[in-house]
């Protein structure tokens, strides 16, 4: 069983990179070269355990591996790598992982250069006080321009890149230099073994056999198997059943000391009981104050998830419960919709989080789902001085009682090649954006915009990719709430409001959004035996209308010649029947119509 390691032989680090710049591949090579995993067990993206992580090529949960590295100076070092998510939705997970380590490898694709996400994550690493080693990956590509990218790192980020490590993670070129750079250029952790235990909860996940597995970084003191520990935010106390380090499989260990990263199990039933960023200490003689910077995860984007087949509702509920075991930032509550039946209103950290959860529900639990239009949380200030949070546009209170509405704003950073800059600026202006900054790094422009989150959650990312042919990269932080003139737009089909299609829009854009929506629905809803009006309305005022004409049966076909009043009588009878039908008829809106209507270009 491995023993505790002395501080100056430990190096804790994370890898910072934009999607597809080779972060997980580099982690694979480091693991392979040091023999941490046997060759026969090696597979691509070994740290990405979810199938969806491998398929999308993204990292969602923070994962860790402990590598024993015999360095050239004759000493064996323990390297703890935390593989962090790169995507903005998981920014809080990134910030916690960053605080658990002392240094970062900044991986930049030598052919593509610095991207928006690289910037966001580097700033987090600098905030956490990291030593950063730049690594240029993919230098064996014909398009690689290491010198240009080095100067870009210096210009855009302000890091000295003169001694950047040049590698190709795919072929393994330069990997030994990375290991030496980790040992000699990153600092060892600090900590006091004699002090009371203070450990940070970096991540947690649910295991069917062990219950909740908690990943910790020990700051001070020593933690041993059998200790009784307390979570400082929740006050819960647990006895430790098992302590281990991850290589990536669990290897049991008797104790963990300062600077070490490992996992523990303690018969914890739910991931919700373990909050990322919490401080763990001993039940008796614990530390006085928790580690700073803890904040509970707040959902930002909400949408309804409904089963296509109403009989799948129970299966969906079970799947949600299982997912929530493993994802504390995902919230859900039951809701009913006249159009879609029973389902759930779910809260997510962002759009990627929404897509990942939906994909996992569909793939791992084999469910067919309808997603309603994503919406954000609005703050509604009432005239009586109270504040309401609005998660679902259907619950909008009567406007006569509302003083004003505030919506969340974001600071978006977009990196884009020069030739597409005009299209990007136009897109941001169309989305009610306010330009804050524009700077150049070589042939790429970096634009910073203040945008309403509501305009981004719908299809901003897809539009951005299409106007820039996929070359733009985008990252955002939520900056706060601001008052704006927002209204609830309802869609009525045959004079019945369809709750699943109602949305919050800015007053200036309501007419355009309403017109586009009713035109789209006119194409999507099949014709019935009676005519169907489709209307977009704000309060009692209709702002757009289309009518689907009725199917017509030729009732006069059997009249040959003769009196015109005979035909008239038949036509009047048909007209009366249609009128009655329209009063009592139910309009069937196909599921596909919902899905397509919600995907519309705005």
UniProtKB/Swiss-Prot annotation:
GO terms for molecular function: GTP binding; GTPase activity; guanosine tetraphosphate binding; ribosome binding; translation elongation factor activity. InterPro entries: EF-4, EFG_II, EFG_III/V, EFG_V-like, EFTu-like_2, G_TR_CS, LepA_C_sf, LepA_CTD. One of its GO terms (biological process) is positive regulation of translation. Coiled coil: none annotated. Its main location: membrane. The keyword NADP does not apply. SMART domains: EFG_C. The keyword Isomerase does not apply. It is a peripheral membrane protein. It holds the Pfam family LepA_C. It is found in: Cell inner membrane. Keywords: Cell inner membrane, Cell membrane, GTP-binding, Hydrolase, Membrane, Nucleotide-binding, Protein biosynthesis. Its EC number is 3.6.5.n1. GTP binds at residues 20-25, 137-140. Required for accurate and efficient protein synthesis under certain stress conditions. May act as a fidelity factor of the translation reaction, by catalyzing a one-codon backward translocation of tRNAs on improperly translocated ribosomes. Back-translocation proceeds from a post-translocation (POST) complex to a pre-translocation (PRE) complex, thus giving elongation factor G a second chance to translocate the tRNAs correctly. Binds to ribosomes in a GTP-dependent manner. Belongs to the TRAFAC class translation factor GTPase superfamily. Classic translation factor GTPase family. LepA subfamily. This is Elongation factor 4. It comes from Cereibacter sphaeroides (strain KD131 / KCTC 12085) (Rhodobacter sphaeroides). The lineage of its organism: Bacteria, Pseudomonadati, Pseudomonadota, Alphaproteobacteria, Rhodobacterales. The gene is lepA.
